[in-house]
Amino acid sequence: KNIVPSLDSITASERTSKIAEIIPKGNFVKDKSTIRLEALGAKGAYGSTIISTELSLGNLVVRAPQGDFPANTNGTVTATAKITDSRGRTASKSIQLNVIDYYAPKILAFIANRAGNGTNKTVISTVLANVSPLIINGSNINRYNLKIQYSEKGTNRWIDAVNLSNETTEIINRQINSGAFYALDKPYNLRLVIQDRISDLADSVILIRSSEVLIALGDGRIGFGGFPELKNQIEF
């Protein structure tokens, strides 16, 4: 006779809703997923009762029929449910989970200059950044958006100059024409924004000076090498 307790199954589900919406069941994301394990259908045998349930994921253990675990490693991970009855007999079930390696978007460098040796309305940006792929069944599902926005200095009104969507390149190293929106006599803030499907956005802000000239005069201002930004000042 079978006098050991029985356990129907162990299940794993994603508790982070943003990830659950895009990642197929049974897959999780390192450092982003919260994995819920649950032991289902635990029963004693011949009058015994279940006195403990232990859930484990790697070296992490929760002593309960249900528990949440961080996804702190990548690769194939074993999840196990173990039950013990009132006679001290045990039963267990295990499943394999796939935890995908991931890192948040990283902006390594963002440089922008006016074209024509600093004398043009057109701005050319150089972007160096990394965006982690999420490879499932051979396909990268972590598409991201890359924006370059500009704002006249002191206004904090951001306008899109570049808007690239559904990008998948992991290592970004490119020059991007950021438009001819930049009046010669005004400085601008330029903002790079990268948003993937998992993390909060990454951004970087830099200053684009007014156009480079030998000397500029007017309205109580004098500028050498660029248009002056402050009244009653001499700027270099």
Give each language-model segment a name:
Residues 1-8, 98-107, 209-219:
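Extracellular interdomain linker/stem segments of modular secreted and single-pass surface proteins
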